[in-house]
């Protein structure tokens, strides 16, 4: 116990708890996509940004602790809009769901959250998890009891019928009345959004009732887009945000689906249509087969007991033989076409990763998604960063509080050595993380 207390004393003393801080010298990327500011100065009082300028234009009061960001890119804390805290990269969902539910709340989900935060993710959306555990972990993070990003949680997946053995985190609906009831239960419990899957197996009346009831409770609805009919019905019902680059190995989205998306994005009066393509896991899978060194990166061990680490390692010893990914090499050539179809149709893209699924570790997924967007899909780095900062905050309705480095907003800020606009992959080594004005990594 004495050694443990000494350890925590050392850790705590290594962080700064001064209420007034100045980040000085780095190149500031504000999250809006504006021209970066060199030799920047950011003033923070408590958890709020109180000044943004340059060394020449903004004076630093004597009472402020100066933190040098010279030679660094400084940007808003990242968002990941599609994570699964309840899983940590194990390849066998059925086994995991049977073995670890009792550890979800106190071990596994906190571990996932901590890994995300250390990777520079200061806000994240958890889509599909056990209801009370999701809310409890979110609230413990918000109260400062455990480290992690500010979490926005959906609670259970809503679908026509839960898969056998998944009833803890998948809820079925049986008719319009039951659909509304399930959404009211989730709303009353305090979820932040609603997550649908397999909505093409529902009746349109059930789907429409879900969306209508969610919107009555000011909850956005996020839905899968694996199959054309999921998209068609979802657009008709008013889904706010689609997930994944779907349609398996089909070479492109059907013309009628793209036309429906065009019609939806043309309606400025109801706001943007959002899409989270979660493309990196599909694109990089074949590289993992040839070189799986990232599986040996110990960053994903953070917070997990040795027994679970060993269990995960054993499950992914042969990445080329995992049933989950057998179609992935065939899907890879279709990804860029589909990604560009969606962009050309006017959807607003969001950075999300599906982190937690087999071999997709919370500590590594977000930067990899950004890297594929920029270096494979051809997205401008400033636009990619905006999709990981401003746009997620806008979608979740908190853009007045977070998402950009602006006066009056919460001080969620990260910094990395070097120029991320030239080398976006530098985000794999985030040097500095500030959440709500507190330095949590330095």
Regions found by a protein language model. Name each.
Residues 1-20:
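Bacterial Sec-dependent N-terminal signal peptides
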Residues 26, 42, 47, 71, ...:
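Divalent metal-coordination and catalytic microenvironments
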Residues 72-140, 164, 205, 226-244:
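Metal-associated gating/positioning segment near the N- to mid-region
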Residues 85-104, 158-177, 246-252, 321-327:
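Acidic/histidine-rich helix-loop elements
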Residues 109-132, 149-156, 188-199, 220, ...:
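Divalent metal-dependent hydrolysis catalytic cores, especially in the metallo-beta-lactamase
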Residues 216, 319-323, 332-419:
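His/Asp/Glu-enriched, well-ordered alpha-helical/loop segment
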